[in-house]
Amino acid sequence: MSQQFAPRDAAEAARAAFASVEGKPFPDDIFTAPQLTWAVIGCGVIANQMASTLELAGRKLAGIYNRTHEKAVAFAEKYGVARVYDTLEELCADPAIDAVYITTPHNTHITYLRAVLSAGKHVLCEKAITLNSEELNEARAIADEHGVQLIDATTILHMPLYRELIRRAEKDEFGNMSIAQVSFGSYKDFDPENRFYNPRLAGGAMLDIGVYALTMARMFMLSQPEDVVSIANACNTGVDVTSGIVMRNPDMQMAVISLTLHSKQPKRAVLSFENCYIEVMDYPRADRA
């Protein structure tokens, strides 16, 4: 099947990119959407995208914290951010901030999650949201204790294309899905000190790109996989660089996933149903299938 689900304009793209704290899309008029006051942790590419997207909606970030204060000041000047925090504690103590977007590398996430959620603020957190299930369960428990929302920012979870495909799958338009085949490959020059290959920075294919592939497959499976088999190659720093993963759930649906940081591979997903197959190219950023 080939059908396009492209945002009609910039405002629609902004609506699609940001969910309300209830986990639902903003209403059609983004200017009357719930007005949370946002701060951001980090000032890299993703933080810049956040600030730019909010500007499309006629809004601004209210605060920023970054470990390198000078970079935070420059970011604030660029986007008109009112507050630059000297410390994480200062951000957490600010009653004017409702929600925080954590955009830093994933090895830092749990530290920020503990602090921000404990301060009673909603959190949108970049992928990988945590390094393992123990950290995620801890963060969820803190969010529940303080009555706030913790939202995974993995793009696939918030894209209009997949909401539409899931809606149609739930109406049984496609029939039962038997298998999902998902690949993601990207060649990264080896540097034992960079975030892709350094174990101290939680490097490796699984945490960097595997999040997309696993999320893509899991979204269309009816139940949690119980059988998981994987084979991985590691580089000399010990992190995984190439892997093959096969999963099966109690509904006898399977997923076959291939990941690599050592070669080019299409970001391609094929979902095989009884009545059709759905192919999605560049699935982490797709607007058509």
Predicted regions, residues:
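Contiguous beta-strand/loop segments that form the cofactor/metal-binding neighborhood of enzyme cores
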Residues: 2, 6-22, 215-286
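N-terminal Rossmann-like dinucleotide-binding module
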Residues: 2-79
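Beta-loop-alpha module in the N-terminal Rossmann-like domain of NAD(P)-dependent dehydrogenases
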Residues: 50, 79-141
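Hydrophobic residues in well-ordered beta-strands that form the structural core
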Residues: 85, 125, 150-152, 280
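Rossmann-fold dehydrogenase core element
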Residues: 137-155, 176-180
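Predominantly a Rossmann-like dinucleotide-binding segment in NAD(P)-dependent oxidoreductases
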Residues: 156-228, 236
